[in-house]
Each structure stands twice: as C-alpha cells, then as structure tokens.
Amino acid sequence: MAVPPTYADLGKSARDVFTKGYGFGLIKLDLKTKSENGLEFTSSGSANTETTKVTGSLETKYRWTEYGLTFTEKWNTDNTLGTEITVEDQLARGLKLTFDSSFSPNTGKKNAKIKTGYKREHVNLGCDVDFDIAGPSIRGALVLGYEGWLAGYQMNFETAKSRVTQSNFAVGYKTDEFQLHTNVNDGTEFGGSIYQKVNKKLETAVNLAWTAGNSNTRFGIAAKYQIDPDACFSAKVNNSSLIGLGYTQTLKPGIKLTLSALLDGKNVNAGGHKLGLGLEFQA
C-alpha cells in the first residue's frame, strides 16, 4: 500500500456495498457527456415519489492537464451556484489545493472554502478552512498507513467558539480482498465495518454502530453479486428488518438501468414499501 486513503474514504469499500445500486423512493436520471475539447457535462434530476419534489443539478468540468488545473462550475434547483478551482502536483508532488465557493442569489448566502491535501507513501494529510459569517472553521485530518494497517484522526476547530467541536479517530486494516474499519466519533459514537471480496463476482460487507448511553445497536449485512459483465444484483438487511434489493443492468454501452426496492420485513403485507428507478446515460 503506497498511499493510504483520505480519512473520509476509510471503510469506503464496505459503504459502497451498502449504498451503491440503490435509490429507494426516487426516480432518477443522470446524463454524462464529454466534448471534443475535453469539457465534461454532468446533469442529474430526481423526483421523490412520496413528496413529489423534483431536484436537479448541472456540473461542467474542464481539466487543463498541462498545468494540473481543474475548473468546475455547479448549479442546482435550489439556485445555488458553485465554482471550484483545483491545482494538483504543481507546487509540490502530492500536494492538492482547491478553492471552493458557492453563492445563493435567492438568500444572498455566500460560502468559501480552501482545501489542501498532501499525500505520499504511508501518509495522507488534509486541512480545510471554511470561511463562514459566524467565523472560520478549520477541519484537519491525518491518515497513516503501514503494511496494510491504517490509523486516522480528524478534528474540527471553530474559531468563533475557540474550541474543538469534533474529534474522530479510526483504525483499520486493508488488503485487496479484505478490509476492517473501526471508528470513534467524539467519544460517544462507535462504529465498525468489514468488507470481504469473496471472489471476482461476489462482495460482502457487515457494519455495526452504537451510541454511548443508548442500548440500541445498529447492525446490517450486504452483498453484491456480479451476474455477468452487464448485470449485477445487490441485497442488504439490517436489524430493523428493512430489506433492500437492487438490480443494475447495462442495456447498451453508455446506458445503465437501476431498479431497487426497500421492503419492511416486519410488515410485508401492510404496504408502504419504497421502489426506485434510475437511468444513466454516458456519451
């Protein structure tokens, strides 16, 4: 393992088994295109079948690879505009700098962030500064890795309050076929996950979480099976007897269909189950 993942990506393989391939209660459409000059367009829209609320977003991205620059423009149906400029591996190898800003014309709210990330063998370091009206906040994270073992720490410091408002710690072990991840958030929330790639077609995951002072433990298991190169089936269940099912099929190159359902195992005949439909086009 040359470079460890960022703190946010610790345990990502297990989370992906639980989250990818599902879209309960949503009808979703995604479109990705790329022009000849390298300009990338990504648009998405979704409708909530319960609230009938429709949301959408548009993103354009241009990479100036000669100078390690990436320019991104974003817009969503809440009428929030965003601009992101990233420069990577230019000032120093492994160093990534990002300026991220957003503006909402309806409310006049503005936000700006400066994100820095530095990675090299055995180390992944990040520091973000969020410039808020109430006062800047600083979020820092560090992950160390050695022979598959990982240890990470994340903190958030709010200058307006002059105190640390978040303190998280994680430990894990990672190989190509197996991953173990445990974390403690603010000394009160505990979690863990296990990821196992059984073979080329089957992936499994287990997660566990609980809060200090609360006897309610959250537990779930999930699996993803690659039926063939164009189709895969996903399933998951938790200790609340909620059963999730997902099926993804590549109809033709660039067109992908996703069907999903969330069933209440305690009230199978009572209704109230959620269905989802997703279409993804890529050209």
Curated annotation (Swiss-Prot):
Binding-site residues, ATP: 12, 20
Topological category with respect to the lipid bilayer: Multi-pass membrane protein
GO molecular function: ATP binding; oxysterol binding; porin activity; voltage-gated channel activity; voltage-gated monoatomic anion channel activity; voltage-gated monoatomic ion channel activity
Sequence positions bearing N6-acetyllysine: 20, 109, 252, 266
A GO term from the CC aspect: membrane raft
Xref: Pfam families: Porin_3
Residues modified to N6-succinyllysine: 20
Regulation: Inhibited by nitric oxide.
Cross-link (Glycyl lysine isopeptide (Lys-Gly) (interchain with G-Cter in ubiquitin)): 12, 20, 53, 61, 109-110, 161, 266, 274
Binding annotation for NAD(+): 242-244, 260-264
Keywords on record: Acetylation, Apoptosis, ATP-binding, Cell membrane, Ion transport, Isopeptide bond, Lipid transport, Lipid-binding, Membrane, Mitochondrion, Mitochondrion outer membrane, NAD, Nucleotide-binding, Phosphoprotein, Porin, Transmembrane, Transmembrane beta strand, Transport, Ubl conjugation
InterPro entries on file: Porin_dom_sf, Porin_Euk, Porin_Euk/Tom40
Post-translational modification as stated in the protein's UniProt record: Phosphorylation at Ser-193 by NEK1 promotes the closed conformational state preventing excessive mitochondrial membrane permeability and subsequent apoptotic cell death after injury. Phosphorylation by the AKT-GSK3B axis stabilizes the protein probably by preventing ubiquitin-mediated proteasomal degradation. Ubiquitinated. Undergoes monoubiquitination and polyubiquitination by PRKN; monoubiquitination at Lys-274 inhibits apoptosis, whereas polyubiquitination leads to its degradation and promotes mitophagy. Deubiquitinated by USP30.
Entries under PROSITE patterns matching the protein: EUKARYOTIC_PORIN (PS00558)
Reaction equations catalysed: chloride(in) = chloride(out); K(+)(in) = K(+)(out); ATP(in) = ATP(out); Ca(2+)(in) = Ca(2+)(out)
Listed CDD domains: Porin3_VDAC (cd07306)
Residue numbers of N-acetylalanine PTMs: 2
Segments passing through the bilayer: 26-35, 39-47, 54-64, 69-76, 80-89, 95-104, 111-120, 123-130, 137-145, 150-158, 163-175, 178-185, 189-198, 202-211, 218-227, 231-238, 242-251, 254-263, 273-282
Subunit architecture: Homodimer and homotrimer; in response to cyclic AMP or calcium; oligomerization is required for scramblase activity. Component of the mitochondrial permeability transition pore complex (mPTPC), at least composed of SPG7, VDAC1 and PPIF. Interacts with SPG7, NIPSNAP2 and SLC25A30. Interacts with hexokinases including HK1. The HK1-VDAC1 complex interacts with ATF2. Interacts with BCL2L1. Interacts with BAK1. Interacts with RTL10/BOP (via BH3 domain). Interacts with amyloid-beta and APP; induces VDAC1 dephosphorylation. Interacts with TMEM41B. Interacts with BCAP31.
Other facts noted in the record for this chain: Dicyclohexylcarbodiimide (DCCD) binding on Glu-73 inhibits hexokinase binding in vitro.
Summary of the function given for this chain in its UniProt record: Non-selective voltage-gated ion channel that mediates the transport of anions and cations through the mitochondrion outer membrane and plasma membrane. The channel at the outer mitochondrial membrane allows diffusion of small hydrophilic molecules; in the plasma membrane it is involved in cell volume regulation and apoptosis. It adopts an open conformation at low or zero membrane potential and a closed conformation at potentials above 30-40 mV. The open state has a weak anion selectivity whereas the closed state is cation-selective. Catalyzes the scrambling of phospholipids across the outer mitochondrial membrane; the mechanism is unrelated to channel activity and is capable of translocating both anionic and zwitterionic phospholipids.
Protein family: Belongs to the eukaryotic mitochondrial porin family.
The protein's name: Non-selective voltage-gated ion channel VDAC1
Organism annotation: Sus scrofa (Pig)
